[in-house]
């Protein structure tokens, strides 16, 4: 008789082939239809909240791998907290204003943007930004990211702009915002000021020069004739702006007389290096004094008709140069402050476009970089050049146009960070920084930073809501003007600032608080984009949900310590007088190629998330984000994704095995802990360990720990051991018998727990599992994310002594399998069920191991037809071997005796007339064979 139909084979609709690229869009459509995000919030409404405030990406390009990493990490956190009972609203946002969009519009339409009406230009920018919001949103949703996609926040929205005006107004009211003329980062190509966070450094070739300034007025302390102060600079073009020479007041300075008769003033610590640069081998020291000795002396500018003052400054170091520092207050922050102390008037001989002005004399009209060579040639010709050297240095560039930038003094609006710096530093104490070094980094950046330049000379930005009195020229910004402009922006949007004249924008009856004047002009600058994004926690989160402020978490790349993290902290302390707007701050690294190199279009090593989703599916992209320790840089390549696909299949196939063997299983079939077989309890105990690992991993945001633990659980504990042993019970035992129901109970608990715990990482696959499995009362079958993660099943757990016994069995099984493989290789057996294994202890360790496992069902656990424990020496005619885990264990593989059961293939000496072993005979007897 053919007993094939008496075997209970796996049956499930859960397919072996994932087909994620084809299957996921339909699942997304269903999730959107039932509004899974809303259901997730409703489930946990009224419970403790976990608020992850979204750092807004800039809306000027399609999503890249950095976006994919960032958004999936956020989704892991939102989903995992939702599945642990937290209320988790997640509102995605976008940063819209700024130079990159302006540049894109100008380039795309070949516009002369200065000739184009500002409202028209801004409308084009807004349409451009909205287009990329839509495209990026589509990409994020395709990744499976849950959020309030119907109501994202946008920094260009009317309500947001209205609230941001209030943020500015409050900081102005407190005296934190002022207008001043001081050096700032300036992009000549884009003709705008830049923030520190908008600067990138690149290595550029450079000519450094040593220049002689002839001493004029020495206050009677030195011989003036033929004596020169030697300065050193890498920015030749700034020499027209030189007004002073700074010395360190405590350092030793010397005047040396060279063989050529000239005398030079330099720092003693840098004397040898300076003389070597100038090719001077013979010289003698004729004077030695501290730097303060030379204070208030003057030196003749090498090519302009004015003198430079010798001043003292503590920041002058002996690391490089001559110790006599070229000081141009229009081009450097330290220079500016030093000259202010000495009441030296400011000059800025470079204009907005980076061209030398009339103040530069004969160099007027030259671009700053073009003037380098001309000035150098003139210095050589006049004899003022002491030396020059070629080298490479790290130089700041604009983050958007990639052009070199300059430092120049211009009238700008500033936020006086100095006024609340101590409070900002103190606020860092109440934040959980992940990694912990984030606190030190943030504190150092705040302590070291200058005042924040918040104005930009651009059109696509939030207008700075300040008026100027036409009578006295002073700025006017009052609570009344702020309230009025906020209301106007809330109703019409900020374009109204450019559509109306100043007198149409001021509140009725406004008079200048300084002079009583009644006519006004409006500010033309716009706010720094970092002020926009730094206000999101107020203009979006706090405005719409004041009870959710401060956010539980900010999560962005490590570059945001000087960007969004910092600007948000400063607006919180400055405008609100509160601490940090986040309780936890988590950072991730960069995405790099498979070799660890930065991905660039020019290198051709970029990877497009859309391509990966098309080829592998969103779940594999998410698995990539979860598998690496994202606190370091995360590598990305097609090869890595192929390997991840293999790991994914191990999880999927494990789930499919469980589901296939749960056909016909319902919650009422669950076996009580006291009735469950010990092997199944071992599996559930291992599952409990995984559950605890999952909770700890989610608590610590260490998703790679979880993915590796699940992979090991599927491969080591399940596939290589437990599931291998289980097949006989599942296929051949009585359908409703305890042994099979015990195994099914364990499989159910395993697949149910894995679907829940891995759902934040693989939402598509885990929901597919969820739809294919049986459920208990209380389960929300609509989507796995609407359910809680399971706690460890402690009632089913084995104690430590029992688990140690299973450790011994697993080690012994490995030893036996090694000898079985040898018997197979020697053609003594085919399958393991053709073997009869005899075990003999030759030392104390082996004897103890056999004593430990002697009462276990070794035949079933070793997957052979019979096992005996013996003291007899092995028969030399059989295949024998020693253990590895237990070297004193002698293992003999004999040919199994008896008849091979045609149903389960076990060999039995007690087969019935049909050749069935006793177990199979009993099971078959229960069946109605006529209906099979």
Which residues fall in each region the model found?
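Alpha-helical recognition segments enriched in aromatics with Gly/Pro capping
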Residues: 314, 342-354, 458-460, 479-633
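Acidic, turn-prone loop/beta-hairpin segments
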Residues: 95, 184, 188, 194-200, ...
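N-terminal catalytic cores of NTP/NDP-binding nucleotidyl/phosphoryl-transfer enzymes
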Residues: 42-103, 164, 231-238, 246, ...
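Protease-associated
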Residues: 240, 244, 251-324, 333, ...
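Cys/His-coordinated zinc-binding microdomains
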Residues: 191, 457, 473, 516, ...
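Residue patterns forming the tRNA-binding/recognition surfaces of aminoacyl-tRNA synthetases
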Residues: 2-13, 17-20, 26, 30-34, ...
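Short cysteine-rich clusters marking metal-coordination/redox-active sites
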Residues: 187, 398, 469, 512-515, ...
